[in-house]
From Swiss-Prot:
GO terms for molecular function: GTP binding; metal ion binding. This is Probable GTP-binding protein EngB. Keywords: Cell cycle, Cell division, GTP-binding, Magnesium, Metal-binding, Nucleotide-binding, Septation. Pfam families: MMR_HSR1. It comes from the Bacteria. The keyword Cell cycle applies. The keyword Cell cycle applies. Necessary for normal cell division and for the maintenance of normal septation. One of its GO terms (cellular component) is cytosol. Mg(2+) binds at residues 55, 77.
Length: 217
């Protein structure tokens, strides 16, 4: 980065910090597209396997302890959960239903696929999807399926590694390289990934800045 680019990046990080330090509120849960809020502000969606740490990351991102409920039952969230950021509202975060739940009946899985596919293809204010991948496991076949769905919908997405504090540095380096390689094979994936730990607050500043940049871009 040039000194000018570095200064601009630091300014973006500070703007994002101030934004998320302000108003962040749960708006609604939408079990079907007809319940979505009016498409009047930019939206950033969060996707990931069940138990990937999505709720914990949303809580860390917003600086709240229990904004997004952490469920002990994987695959429990089968709705699009909306959170508003800013006063007045500058953007909305969309917590998408988790995928890859082994015990879900086929009907539930099909309902999930239809809801997510139709949301991705038809939501004009959706600026970016953040695809969360567990650092301990790397990209799984179900993650590949989600990437394919995003590619087909033409929705740009960033890959975010979660729980980076749970593995050794050498293992993290390996899974990061493998994830970058997987992203570069995809048409709609952002080529750089963000490595995070909700528990250690690692990468949270960068993630906030990315969310703000994507929403306003």
């Amino acid at each position: 980065m040039t000194p000018e680019e570095q200064a601009a990046h630091q300014e973006l990080i500070e703007q994002a910090r101030l934004l998320f330090a302000g108003r962040v509120e749960f708006l609604k849960s939408a079990p079907a597209l007809k319940f979505l809020p009016d498409p009047d502000v930019p939206e950033i969606a969060f996707a990931g396997r069940s138990n990937v740490g999505k709720s914990s990351l949303l809580n860390a991102l917003t600086g709240r302890k229990s904004l997004a409920r952490t469920s002990v039952t994987p695959g429990r969230t089968q709705e699009l959960n909306y959170f508003e950021v800013g006063e007045p509202t500058r953007l909305r975060l969309v917590d998408m239903p988790g995928y890859g739940f082994a015990k879900a009946p086929p009907k539930v899985v099909e309902t999930w696929r239809r809801l997510v596919r139709d949301f991705l293809r038809g939501r004009v204010v959706l600026k970016r999807t953040l695809l969360l991948i567990d650092s301990r496991h790397g990209v799984k076949p179900v993650d590949d399926d989600m990437m394919q769905m995003l590619d087909e919908a033409g929705v740009g997405y960033r890959i975010v590694l979660t729980k980076a504090d749970k593995i050794k540095a050498s293992e993290l380096e390996k899974v990061t390289a493998e994830t970058i390689a997987a992203a570069r094979k995809r048409t709609a994936a952002y080529p750089e990934i963000i490595v995070t730990s909700s528990e250690k607050k690692m990468g949270i500043e960068e993630l906030r800045a990315a969310v703000l940049q994507d929403a306003m871009g």
